[in-house]
Amino acid sequence: MFGQTASGSAALSPSGARVFRYEVVGLRQNEETDRMEFPIRRSGSTFITVPYNRMNEEMQRITRMGGKIVSITPVVAS
């Protein structure tokens, strides 16, 4: 996920090319994460890279998984 870029028609719009990195703490194993093939780690921060057009959905998913977003920073293309 690190260094993720948007492609297709979303990349043509000004918002489609914007990507943000969430710093999340407190993710825990629950019904939502039990459907995954791997366990959630129990300590420290997790970084999730999200395109602008999926920010709301990702915030909801993080909340359902028991996480708390402690920071959101834009990813600057270099």
UniProtKB/Swiss-Prot annotation:
Topological type in the membrane: Peripheral membrane protein
**The organism's place on the tree of life at top rank:** Bacteria
Q: What is its main location?
A: membrane
Enumerate the Pfam families for this protein.
CpcD (PF01383)
Cited SMART domains: CpcD
Tell me which Gene Ontology terms the entry assigns under biological process: photosynthesis
Record bears the keyword Manganese: no
Matching entries from InterPro entries are given as: CpcD-like_dom
Q: Name one GO cellular component term.
A: phycobilisome
Q: Where is the CpcD-like domain?
A: 17-75
Localization terms from the record? Cellular thylakoid membrane
Which keywords does UniProt give here? Antenna complex, Membrane, Photosynthesis, Phycobilisome, Thylakoid
Keyword Glycoprotein: yes or no? Answer: no
Summarizing the function annotation, the protein's role is:
Rod linker protein, associated with phycocyanin. Linker polypeptides determine the state of aggregation and the location of the disk-shaped phycobiliprotein units within the phycobilisome and modulate their spectroscopic properties in order to mediate a directed and optimal energy transfer.
What does the similarity note say? Belongs to the phycobilisome linker protein family.
Q: What is this protein called?
A: Phycobilisome 8.9 kDa linker polypeptide, phycocyanin-associated, rod
